[in-house]
Amino acid sequence: MNKIYSVSHFSFIDGIILRKRKEMLKIIKKTLEKYNVLSCIDVGTTSYEENESSNYIIKNLSHIPNIISISNQEIKNPLFKEKILKSITQNFSNDEFFKLKSDIVISNATIEHVGSFENQIKMVNNIINLSKKKFIIITPNRYHPIDFHTKIPFLHWLPKVIHRKILSLVGLSFYSREENLNLLSKADLIKIMNDLNFKNYKIFNIKLLGFVSNFILIFKIN
């Protein structure tokens, strides 16, 4: 699997993304306010820090004493007490789960970059095994009119085979490969949770231009 990709945005677009991430952060802080959170894993941390929106959510949870990064990129940010150079879709040993398990696990804009639907299920299953209290997964909505990866409107609404073929034809071969971009709908998220028999979750909507742009899936362990 290729490295989880961080998009270099124009400042205008990054400003929009930043505003949306501020909304997400409010929801996350609200859902965590009753919990004594001493440890956190950030899944899919990006090494690309030039966008103001990059790693925005975890940077604004820096009050948590012990923050760990799990990423297939080399992370140098001193925010993280431990940096695990590993894809979240890889196998974890029982010892790794025991050692790394944290109060909460957060993953923002990562699940759409891990490849197939089976890989997305594996990612969520690994996350549940790394979580003590809650996990939070944030991902773009496939059915928002604009895909902020390609900046092309509506094309991603086509069947995925056709969408990927057109991306390849117009020179966006990176995004044409499932291993690099596999957008999800709300129904896809629900199916993942159902396939894993996880019931105790909520999905929050973030809107942009009147359409749902992102989903925040929050699962409560206990």
What are these model-predicted stretches?
Residues 176-197:
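Short alpha-helix
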Residues 1-35:
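Class I SAM-dependent methyltransferase Rossmann-like catalytic core
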Residues 16-24, 49, 119, 181-188:
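Soluble or luminal CAZymes and related metallo-dependent hydrolases
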Residues 150-153, 160-179:
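Short, glycine-/aromatic-enriched active-site segment of Class I SAM-dependent methyltransferases
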Residues 35-144, 219-220:
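Conserved SAM-binding loop
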Residues 134-162:
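Conserved class I S-adenosyl-L-methionine
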Residues 201-222:
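Core SAM-dependent methyltransferase catalytic element
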Residues 9-15, 109-118, 175-180:
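Surface-exposed cleft-lining segments at the edges of enzyme active sites
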